[in-house]
UniProtKB/Swiss-Prot annotation:
PTM annotation: The disulfide bond which can form in the large chain dimeric partners within the hexadecamer appears to be associated with oxidative stress and protein turnover.
Protein name: Ribulose bisphosphate carboxylase large chain
Residue numbers of N6,N6,N6-trimethyllysine PTMs: K5
The EC number(s) this enzyme carries: 4.1.1.39
Cofactor: Mg(2+)
Active site: K166 (proton acceptor), H285 (proton acceptor)
InterPro entries: RuBisCO, RuBisCo_large_chain_AS, RuBisCO_lsu_C, RuBisCO_lsu_C_sf, RuBisCO_lsu_fd_N, RuBisCO_lsu_N_sf, RuBisCO_lsuI
C-alpha cells in the first residue's frame, strides 16, 4: 500500500479532541457557531479549529514534512447555547508557535482571517480570546497606562472629562481652536477631534494642530490645570500619520489620537511605540467597530477588539456608554471595561467573559464613555464606570443654551458634585437627580 492517502477528509478525526488538556501557553478562543443545517456541531467546531490553524480541505503530502500534532489548533470543548436551537460555543486551543511575537495583526489574521467565510457555517462570532502571558509579554501594550497618565496630568480621584468639538466638519482652524479654548477654560480636562477630522480642504491638519496648541496653553495658564486635546493623527499612509505625531510632539501637546480599526493594527502599534518613546498619550477611537461587532451571531465581539487594542497600545479607548440600555448589556460592557483596565479578570459568563485573563502588569487603558450622554447621566456614569474612566460629552457640552464654556462648567460642577456625594456615602442611583439639582444652584 501507499504510505499517503489522498482525498477529502473528515475534520473530526484530527481537530476535535475533547480529551485535550489546554496548555498555559496556548491562545484559547471561544467561538459562537451557527452550523448549516445537517452539519454536526463537532464537525463544525473541528472545521473552525482546522481552518484557522494548519488545516486545508484535503490531505496534502507536505503534511508529512511537519508535525501536525505540534502545530494544529484543537477544538477541545463544545457547548450548546441556551435558548438557541442550533448554536454552540466552540472552544479552540492554538499552540503559541502559530503566532508572530508582538503582532496583533498576525494574531487576528490567524484566528479570524479565513474561517469566517467557511461554507459549513451559517455564522461565526469570536466571543473571547485568552491571551497567555507567554504571548502578551511580547507586546508593550499601552504607551503609558492609567497610573502614569494620572501622574502626568496630576488629576486623581475622579473620572476625567472630555468633549468632542462639533460641528465636526466645516469649522476653520481658528474657530476650531476657539471652541477648544472655551471648553477647556470652562473646566474640561480634554477636548477631542472627531474621528473623521483628518486633513480636509476646509481645515488642514497643520493649521488645526497649531491653533489647538495655542488654545491649550492659554487655557492651561488661566486655570492652572493641565489640559489636553486629542489631535487626530490618523492619515492615509503610516508615514503621514507619523509626521503628524512628530509635529504634535514638537508643539509640546500632551496627547494624540488614532482611529485604530480604520487605520489598522500595524499603524496603531507603530504609533503606540512612538508615543511611548516621546511621552505622548494616545487616545484611541473605535470607528468601524460596529461593522465587526454589531451582529450577535457573526463577527467579533468588542471585548476581543478591546483586548487586541490593549496589546497593540492605547491609553484611552471608546467603550460605549451603558446608560439607558438593557441591564444585561450593562454587565457585558462592564466586563470588557474591566478587561481594559484591570490586571487580572476572572472568568464570568454572566459578564460575557469566557476565560480568566491575566495581563501580568501590562498597563491598563482608560475606557471612554461617549455618545449621546449629558449632564443628567452623570450620577449613573460615575457609579457605573468609577474613577478610572473618561466621560465625554459632545453635544452635551456645546449644546448648552449659553455656549461652550458654561456647558463645560456645568459638566465639571456636576462631576465634582457626584464624586463628593459618592465619597460621602450617598446613593447616586437613588439621589442622582437631587444631587445635580443642588449642584446647579
Amino acid at each position: 500500500g501507499v504510505g499517503f492517502k489522498a482525498g477529502v477528509k473528515d475534520y473530526r478525526l484530527t481537530y476535535y479532541t475533547p480529551e485535550y488538556k489546554t496548555k498555559d501557553t496556548d491562545i484559547l478562543a471561544a467561538f459562537r457557531m451557527t452550523p448549516q443545517p445537517g452539519v454536526p456541531a463537532e464537525e463544525a467546531g473541528a472545521a473552525v479549529a482546522a481552518e484557522s490553524s494548519t488545516g486545508t480541505w484535503t490531505t496534502v503530502w507536505t503534511d508529512g514534512l511537519t508535525s501536525l500534532d505540534r502545530y494544529k489548533g484543537r477544538c477541545y470543548d463544545i457547548e450548546p447555547v441556551a435558548g438557541e436551537e442550533n448554536q454552540y460555543i466552540a472552544y479552540v486551543a492554538y499552540p503559541l508557535d502559530l503566532f508572530e511575537e508582538g503582532s496583533v495583526t498576525n494574531m487576528l489574521t490567524s484566528i479570524v482571517g479565513d474561517v469566517f467565510g467557511f461554507k459549513a457555517l451559517r455564522a461565526l462570532x469570536x466571543e473571547d480570546l485568552r491571551i497567555p502571558p507567554a504571548y502578551s509579554k511580547t507586546f508593550l501594550g499601552p504607551p503609558h497606562g492609567i497610573q502614569v497618565e494620572r501622574d502626568k496630568l496630576n488629576k486623581y480621584g475622579r473620572p476625567l472629562l472630555g468633549c468632542t468639538i462639533k460641528p465636526k466638519l466645516g469649522l476653520s482652524a481658528k474657530n476650531y481652536g476657539r471652541a477648544v479654548y472655551e471648553c477647556l477654560r470652562g473646566g474640561l480636562d480634554f477636548t477631542k477631534d472627531d474621528e473623521n477630522v483628518n486633513s480636509q480642504p476646509f481645515m488642514r491638519w497643520r493649521d488645526r494642530f497649531l491653533f489647538v496648541a495655542e488654545a491649550l496653553f492659554k487655557s492651561q495658564a488661566e486655570t492652572g490645570e493641565i489640559k489636553g486635546h486629542y489631535l487626530n493623527a490618523t492619515a492615509g499612509t503610516c508615514e503621514e500619520m507619523m509626521k503628524r505625531a512628530v509635529f504634535a510632539r514638537e508643539l509640546g501637546v500632551p496627547i494624540v489620537m488614532h482611529d485604530y480599526l480604520t487605520g489598522g493594527f500595524t499603524a496603531n502599534t507603530s504609533l503606540a511605540f512612538y508615543c511611548r518613546d516621546n511621552g505622548l498619550l494616545l487616545h484611541i477611537h473605535r470607528a468601524m467597530h460596529a461593522v465587526i461587532d454589531r451582529q450577535k451571531d457573526h463577527g467579533m465581539h468588542f471585548r476581543v477588539l478591546a483586548k487586541a487594542l490593549r496589546m497593540s497600545g492605547g491609553d484611552h479607548i471608546h467603550a460605549g456608554t451603558v446608560v439607558g440600555k438593557l441591564e444585561g448589556e450593562r454587565e457585558v460592557t462592564l466586563g470588557f471595561v474591566d478587561l481594559l483596565r484591570d490586571d487580572y479578570i476572572e472568568k464570568d459568563r454572566s459578564r460575557g467573559i469566557y476565560f480568566t485573563q491575566d495581563w501580568v502588569s501590562m498597563p491598563g487603558v482608560f475606557p471612554v464613555a461617549s455618545g449621546g450622554i449629558h449632564v443628567w447621566h452623570m450620577p449613573a456614569l460615575t457609579e457605573i464606570f468609577g474613577d478610572d474612566s473618561v466621560l465625554q460629552f459632545g453635544g452635551g457640552t456645546l449644546g448648552h443654551p449659553w455656549g461652550n464654556a458654561p456647558g463645560a462648567v456645568a459638566n465639571r460642577v456636576a462631576l465634582e458634585a457626584c464624586v463628593q456625594a459618592r465619597n460621602e456615602g450617598r446613593d447616586l442611583a437613588r439621589e442622582g437627580n437631587e444631587i445635580i439639582r443642588e449642584a446647579s444652584k
